[in-house]
Regions:
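Non-catalytic alpha-helical scaffolds and adjoining flexible linkers that form interface surfaces
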Residues: 1-172
């Protein structure tokens, strides 16, 4: 099933496909992560817009069963600081990678998309990237089957005593 859509997205990565073409993975706000086919990518008018860590407003064809296609990009905003600072790039790559594995392809998840974008915005604004990353990890860890328990003792399950947090046992 193919549909023409207008959506925001973030370029997660791209890779060469055949001689001239590219496959570009974009986390879209409205349709989840999608793989887009870009023919003659080097000569494409979209080439500069399809770099990693670039926010897009795109018009395209979303295909539920295979590759999707871009017909136009009305806005492309690269993260300048993230792309120029090796540490910011490393943290941003880690957040993008976590988001990629936290969500199956083609699954809609606007909250995760928004949270990733906000986290990248904060890194771009030079907010402490270690803190931003730690908060991001805490928020998405439940998607991997892990969670912290602050509500009770993880051994005796009492709630009426002062507690101390244990990293070893992921709880109080």
């Amino acid at each position: 099933d193919m549909k023409n859509v207008d959506t925001r997205g973030l370029v997660l990565f791209s890779r060469h496909y055949r001689e001239q073409d590219k496959l570009v993975k974009i986390f879209t706000e409205r349709f989840g992560k999608r793989m887009f086919f870009v023919k003659n990518a080097g000569k494409s008018r979209f080439a500069s817009s399809l770099q990693n860590f670039t926010q897009l407003e795109l018009l395209g064809t979303i295909n539920d069963d295979g590759l999707s296609f871009i017909s136009d990009i009305s806005e492309a905003k690269p993260y300048q600081f993230i792309n120029s600072d090796i540490f910011a790039q490393a943290y941003a790559s880690y957040l993008v990678g976590l988001s990629d594995v936290a969500l199956p392809d083609n699954h809609y998840d606007a909250p995760l998309y928004g949270f990733l974008m906000k986290s990248l915005d904060l890194i771009e604004e030079k907010i402490d990237m270690v803190v931003v990353t730690f908060i991001f990890e805490l928020q998405v860890m439940s998607r991997f089957g892990a969670q912290l328990d602050f509500g009770q003792c993880v051994f005796c399950h009492r709630k009426d005593l002062p507690m101390d947090f244990s990293y070893k046992f992921n709880g109080c």
